[in-house]
Amino acid sequence: MEESISGGRRKQYARPTINSYMYGNAMALSNIGLMKGDEEMAMKYALKADSIKTLVQEKLWNDKMKFFETLRKDTLAGVREAIGYIPWYFNLPDSKKYDDAWKQVMDEKGFSAPFGLTTAERRHPQFRSHGVGRCEWDGAIWPFATSQTLTAMANFINDYPQEILSDSVYFRQMELYVESQYRRGRPYIGEYLDEVNGNWLMGDRERSRYYNHSTFNDLIITGLVGLRPRMDNTIEVNPLIPEGKWNWFCLDNVLYHGHDITIIWDKNGNRYHQGKGLRVLVDGKLVGMTDKLQKLICENVL
């Protein structure tokens, strides 16, 4: 993030972003080692990941602010920014003490704005203080940052025993994310937009309209519909759609572990004529179902 409240691109600070990415890379390499039967490789990168996790939790967590922050030369920045949610993108945090950070996505003085999640907390005196068109991440809404936060949020809801966020919070933020991607009545995604009126900032610049750096499809597949990636032969589906919001949906032709996956939700059974409820099919064969829109685990079906 080029220009931010915690420090711009030229400041060599320790941030939740890069350190979380390194943790994710190390964990991925460790898992690759396990998959190929290379115990030495798996252990090497697992130890690297563990070391990074310890440093992130010890050095970047502000216990007073209840948030992961940027570490300047010797002190934390003292500002909550959306990058503080990226540790959950890789399931890095390992204690409930960090859960309170997620309360800020529902707080209008935190990150909650009429058109989505801001890149910095709205209560901060330097919010939106860097001007416009200067690559500033000081509050305006960036689809890239929103994508990261929503992925982290889905992980937090799915992978942690927590009572702070419900599927309705995720669903509403996804609605805002989708609704914001229009300009002059046509589908559009640019660099960033105003958090209050939804106008795209610098929308007439060529580079902005080619700035499709969100992860829209992944948010729909793994978050909203809820196909949760796993290493084993089990399919896990947990739609983050509140009861009563959608009566039907179909996610089809998803290549997963070399198989064609279909996920159907048909509340009354009269939309797709495959029966009532939530159904999972692998290569056209039914492998699991439930009457309600809820978590469904289909073991050893791949």
Predicted regions and their residues:
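Short, glycine-/Ser/Thr-/acidic-enriched flexible segments
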Residues: D74, L92-S95, A154-I157, P242, ...
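Non-catalytic carbohydrate-binding regions of carbohydrate-active enzymes
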Residues: K36, E40-T70, D100-H259
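Well-ordered alpha-helical segments within folded domains of soluble proteins
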Residues: R15-N31, V79-L92, G139-N155, N212-T222
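Polysaccharide-binding and catalytic clefts of secreted carbohydrate-active enzymes
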Residues: R10-I18, N62
